[in-house]
Amino acid sequence: MPRTCADYEERRDKALELFALKGFGQVSMRELAAHVGLTAGSLYHHFPSKQHLLFDLIEELYEELLATLHPSGRGRDATARLSAVIRAHWELHAERPLQFRLAERDLCCLSEEQQAQIAGMRQDYEQRLLALIAPTSRLSGPALQASAQVVASLLNSLPGWLQNSAAPEAQRLALMESMLRGAIERGLPAGISSAA
């Protein structure tokens, strides 16, 4: 990677750390510039705006979430697909915990247009998720949409909730899978248990 790209990524990662630590709205441009090793005036040569940087970080997370739903596992049964999706989310959360925090907490700091773009990505993610793990659910309309939102929220929040547990990682992952499987089997009639 050329040095300028590496510098950009390093500054972006430092900005992510600061936003996650303090909250996007609590970080001034001057503080952001100092934290990433730039002057306030030169910051705009590297990032169009603080808000654009936040959008870029959240958008990247949703692109990664969509990638976890790649259809390569479609030939397996629904139980195996769910296990693969859970493991992929667990690993993504381990790699990007700060981006998950930003996406949950600071989404409201984006412009209406940026929020709409992220909402579209999230809706696409939720629909693909349900198509992959519960393709035969008897729910439809608003009930199916609400179920998709709940399952997606659980997938994206459970790793963070479980990270401070004293239980070994394998146990935490098994607990996450058990909770999600129960929610899907009970909440999505004829969902995962009968899907193949």
Show which residues each predicted segment covers.
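N-terminal intrinsically disordered/low-complexity leader segments
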Residues: M1-A6, E17, L188-A196
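Amphipathic C-terminal alpha-helical segment
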Residues: L92-E95, L102, A131, G141-P142, ...
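Short, structured helix-loop boundary elements
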Residues: Y8-E9, M29, Q51, F55, ...
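Anionic, Ser/Thr-rich low-complexity intrinsically disordered regions
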Residues: A40-S42, L61, L65, G73-G75, ...
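Hydrophobic alpha-helical connector segments
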Residues: D56, H70-L98, S147-V151
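Amphipathic alpha-helical packing segments from all-alpha helical-bundle domains
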Residues: E63-L66, L92, E112-R138, Q145-Q149, ...
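Helix-turn-helix
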Residues: A6, E10, K14, L18-H52, ...
